[in-house]
Amino acid sequence: MNNFTIKETPIKDLVIIEPKVFGDERGFFQETYNKESFAELGLNMEFVQDNHSKSKKGVLRGLHFQTKNVQGKLVRVTRGAVYDVAVDLRTNSPTFGEWYGVLLTEKNKIMFYVPEGFAHGFLTLEDDTEFLYKCTNLYSPEHDSGLRWNDPTINIDWKFEEFNITEEDLTISDKDKVQQLFDKSSTY
């Protein structure tokens, strides 16, 4: 029996994964990754690095990708909530340059698989949000790259109004404030 179900998104290979959660008066139990179960669902990846971040409300991280040693990421929230976004950078894809976003929370327990060839970022919606991601390749500082979170060509709707966050409330790293623009990049 497979403890995961997949929901397709409008962008090929970018999927939402819903784990089966076993709950009772003690709490809950869930698998967050099972290589065999994922393979049954057509998800054949191998993870080599796990990352864990903690952020206050209004932190916007991204949009990150690596130009070589590209990373696929399986992401989830263990505390709090994020609006998670992926941008298709696969030049041969019919959805090249398109984005998709999903709400990940500690309550909904869903996971988002962002395959290799995508830029990735997220906006934290609560204080003390904890975010975990498994990566298919090691972090490579010399290949680290990104796109600007507010790139006018990609035009991501970060749903600030819906989440009661203003642009003035955002906390963004200096690096992410000056990432390249989509139509000026030659890195993908």
Language-model region placement:
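Short beta-strand His + acidic residue motifs that chelate non-heme Fe in jelly-roll/DSBH
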Residues: 112, 120-125, 133
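Non-catalytic, conserved peripheral segments adjacent to functional cores
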Residues: 1-107, 126-128, 135-188
